[in-house]
Design a protein with these regions (language model features):
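Acidic, proline/glycine-enriched N-terminal capping motif
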Residues: 1-155
Length: 155
C-alpha cells in the first residue's frame, strides 16, 4: 500500500481556460498544486523503492481531505467542529479535489488513473489543512458461488 500525507491545502481541479487563439490551458493554481503533489509522490515512491502500478492492475484509492474551519467562526464553534471531525460541506467539491490528486499521481504512483476502480473519499474539518492518500491493489472477490451463477444463467 502506498500512503502519502501532505500538509498542503488541497486545491480542486480548475476548469480549463482558453487563450484568445482558442488553446486550452490549466489554471496556474491547479497546475502548481498538481506539480507539488506529483513531486512529493515521486519522492516518496523513490524513497520506498516502489514500482509504478501497471495500468492492468485494478486499484483502490482512499483520500481524506482536511480543512481548517473559517477564522470568522467563534473559537468555540471552531474547536467543536475540529474535535468532532465534522464533515465539510462547503466548496470545493470532492470530485474536483480528487481529480487533481488523481492527475498528479498519473505516471508516478500508477500508469494511468483509469486503473482506479474503487474510491473512498472524505472531506472534514481539522486543525490544519492537509490530506492523506492511500493507494492499494484492489482484491477481486467473487461474491457468489457456481450454484448462484448457474441459476442466473437459467433465467
Amino acid at each position: 500500500m502506498f500512503v502519502l500525507r501532505c500538509n498542503l491545502t488541497a486545491v480542486g481541479k480548475g476548469r480549463p481556460r482558453f487563450t484568445r487563439s482558442g488553446l486550452a490551458y490549466t489554471p496556474k493554481k491547479t497546475a502548481d498544486f498538481e506539480k507539488k503533489v506529483k513531486s512529493l509522490a515521486k519522492e516518496k515512491m523513490q524513497s520506498e523503492e516502489r514500482q509504478v502500478y501497471a495500468k492492468s492492475i485494478p486499484l483502490k484509492m482512499t483520500v481524506f481531505f482536511y480543512f481548517a474551519p473559517p477564522k470568522s467562526w467563534s473559537k468555540k464553534k471552531r474547536q467543536s467542529c475540529i474535535e468532532e471531525h465534522l464533515p465539510k460541506t462547503t466548496k470545493c467539491d470532492l470530485s474536483n479535489l480528487i481529480k487533481c490528486v488523481e492527475d498528479a499521481f498519473n505516471g508516478v504512483v500508477y500508469e494511468d488513473d483509469s486503473s482506479v476502480a474503487e474510491l473512498n473519499l472524505g472531506k472534514y474539518y481539522a486543525e490544519k489543512d492537509a490530506f492523506t492518500v492511500f493507494v492499494e491493489r484492489l482484491d477481486m472477490v467473487d461474491d457468489f458461488d457456481e450454484s448462484e451463477r448457474s441459476e442466473q444463467e437459467e433465467e
